Amino acid sequence: MHSSSVHVPLIEFLKNRIYLGAYDHHKRDTEDLAYFTVEDALPYNAFYMDFGPLNIGHLYRFAVLLHKKLNEDSTQGKGLVIYSSTSPKERANLACLLCCYMILLQNWAPHQVLQPIAQITPPLQAFRDAGYSSADYEITIQDVVYAMWRAKERGMIDLAKFDLDEYEQYERVDQGDFNVISKDFIAFASPQQSKRGGLNEPFQKVLEYFVENNVQLVVRLNSHLYDAKEFTKRNIKHIDMIFDDGTCPTLEYVQKFIGAAECIINKGGKIAVHCKAGLGRTGCLIGAHLIYTHGFTANECIAYMRMIRPGMVVGPQQHWLYLHHDDFRSWRHTMIVDNRPDPLIGNLFPLCSYEDYKQRLKEAKRKERLQLQQQLTSPLADSSVINTPIRRRKVSGALASKIQTVVPIESPGQPRKYFEDSEDIDEVEMVNNSDDENTMQDIIQSSPARYDSVTPKTKDNSDWRVLRSISTNNVSSQQSIHIIKTTTTKTVNETLSSPPGTSPTNVLRVSKARSKNRIASGNSQTSRAHSGGVRKLSGKKH
């Protein structure tokens, strides 16, 4: 192969097929080599002292020209030397284009494309920012290569689907001056209105594109140069997150921005961000989200954005992105979109610490449980909500007097009873079992209208029996009483006094022999008091 007339080595990428060279004069083809340059066809449009890297539109055009040259008959069987001038800047731009081509179209790994250009002499110049100050931060071809590789792996770039016409149209100032950075973000320069309601052509292009491409949020970072209603009346949400030109946002601002962006992305929409030129402040916030989402390093992020929109991230903003790129990547695992809206970002939701979020949820659940317990245990809840209130009936005096002579006021429940009989005791106790273990007393009163079927049919005051409740009734105060005591285990019938008229206590006494006749061993007999109620007496002799 022919040696170069200058001291720049010929770099082999594909043996006998693709080489990288540098010459200060036009080279003619030889029998072994064909020469090809794109330096004049793909110029870089500088802002100030910046010179590259060439953007993705240049990369697409380079790939088209290279494929065309490789397929020409004149290059068949020859090595193709792609060359530039010997300027370090031009050499760097061409080397960067060729490396990105090998990454995106030939699917080479980063180390494969970096190995041929490693430690070459003279070295390739690093890229600087578009600012007017001295360049104190640089990115290298290695940063660009890894940026393109990561973007390809994350599905952010596909040259086979790239629309060159659209890209080159809208990057022009008179056509809107915006670029689609990723499927989620658009970076653009601030639209301007000379008067309210008037739309110039660039602003009209921006509005039309945003409506057609589902842009749901516009974030303004600079002072007002247009009426935000131009977006909102087209159903595009608009928020202001203004900070000074050339400065960097606070981390709190970045958290709010990323949270707001996540809210829109989760709904399938896009976010458009602008400052005055759509480069510095815009690059800070979009870059922070790219690092948060895709794991770029700061240098990779800057390189990627400049490949899409040249000049992004200026001056100290480069250092800021480098200092905080670890924070942005860690937020992916330590922060979450909050559930409390933030008025600063149009009531969208910012990022918040995952631990704080969990603690707040626990505290909210604890307060909710405590409030529920207080409602359940409050007297008002017990009486008016849970339990139905008991309504007590009022009974007149005349009716109460009649009830007393007919049935007991309180029921003994469901008794289980038996007799205890003793030869040495003249009276027999009847103990009635009750479920609530309260002693109930029923007064058995003799009645002149009914006779016992067991005892002789002679009118005797001791034979008259009815049921009445304990009360102070003047009419029956001179009559005999019989008391039945009720407990949970037995029923005992006890005669408390002698027949009526013989004792001031007026308690009926029943003889032992008579008790045995009324309750026979092995038989169950019923004694009815027809005037008031029924008392069933049963039991065995012990």
Swiss-Prot record:
Keyword Nucleotide-binding set for record: no
EC number: 3.1.3.48
Induction comment from the UniProt entry of this chain: Both during budding and hyphal growth, no detectable levels are observed in G1 cells but, as cells passe through S-phase, begins to accumulate with a peak being reached during mitosis.
Top-level division of the source organism's lineage: Eukaryota
Record's catalysed reaction(s): O-phospho-L-tyrosyl-[protein] + H2O = L-tyrosyl-[protein] + phosphate
GO MF, one annotated term: protein tyrosine phosphatase activity
Gene Ontology CC terms, in alphabetical order: cell septum; cellular bud neck; cytoplasm; kinetochore; mitotic actomyosin contractile ring, intermediate layer; mitotic spindle; mitotic spindle midzone; new mitotic spindle pole body
Listed CDD domains: CDC14_C, CDC14_N
UniProt feature, compositional bias: Polar residues: 518-529
Pfam families linked: DSPc, DSPn
SUPFAM superfamilies reported for this sequence: (Phosphotyrosine protein) phosphatases II
Biological processes, Gene Ontology terms: autophagy of mitochondrion; cellular response to glucose starvation; cellular response to osmotic stress; DNA damage response; hyphal growth; invasive filamentous growth; invasive growth in response to glucose limitation; meiotic nuclear division
Stretches the record annotates as Disordered: 516-542
Disruption phenotype: Leads to defective cell separation and impairs hyphal growth.
SMART domains cross-referenced by the UniProt entry: DSPc, PTPc_motif
Main function: Protein phosphatase which antagonizes mitotic cyclin-dependent kinase CDC28, the inactivation of which is essential for exit from mitosis. To access its substrates, is released from nucleolar sequestration during mitosis. Plays an essential in coordinating the nuclear division cycle with cytokinesis through the cytokinesis checkpoint. Involved in chromosome segregation, where it is required for meiosis I spindle dissambly as well as for establishing two consecutive chromosome segregation phases.
Cross-referenced PANTHER family: TYROSINE SPECIFIC PROTEIN PHOSPHATASE AND DUAL SPECIFICITY PROTEIN PHOSPHATASE (PTHR23339)
Similarity comment: family membership: Belongs to the protein-tyrosine phosphatase family. Non-receptor class CDC14 subfamily.
Name of this chain's protein: Tyrosine-protein phosphatase CDC14
